[in-house]
Amino acid sequence: MNILIYKWKVFNQADVKSAFEYFGHSVDMYEEKPLSSDSITGIKEHDYVLLADVFREYDVIFSLNYFPHVSDICEQTGRKYVAWTVDSPLISLYHQSVFNSCNNIFIFDKFFYYELKQLGVKNIYYLPLAVNTDRLSSQLDSQTREEKERFSADISFVGSMYHKNSYDDIKDKLPP
């Protein structure tokens, strides 16, 4: 299968690309250059004609998080759009384009999944987040014994809680 990853500033796109390639798919990454962008509102003007031309070369368009304009262009060009959320709640999922038949949307937040399912969104699925364990294992193998002892734990939280310094607000309430 010929897959295009719609690239943006997110941390785990390389892991997804590696997984697709591991299963024998041809994968390219494409980073859109908006025609214009408003720094105050964040609204971007997209070149729909250019994107449609790019998308026509692929069987599937994939993105981490959901982009309404990508869905609309996939609907128009007859391409499948697969989106896997990495943020929650993701406001873009409240756009009318979630009802496009081209979509296959995967959401890691089960409560948000249920909410959208109850709103009648079809082709929406629950899928937890994932990681390339081979990549992480190779990083761990390069650590010294002292680093491994210093950073070892029974449970680790990796990621962010969407609030600046929220750990500082809860650290005194955590068990030792």
Locate the predicted segments by residue:
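Nucleotide-sugar donor-binding catalytic core of glycosyltransferases
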Residues: 2-13, 119-176
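Extended catalytic core of nucleotide-activated donor transferases of GT-like folds
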Residues: 6-119, 134-143
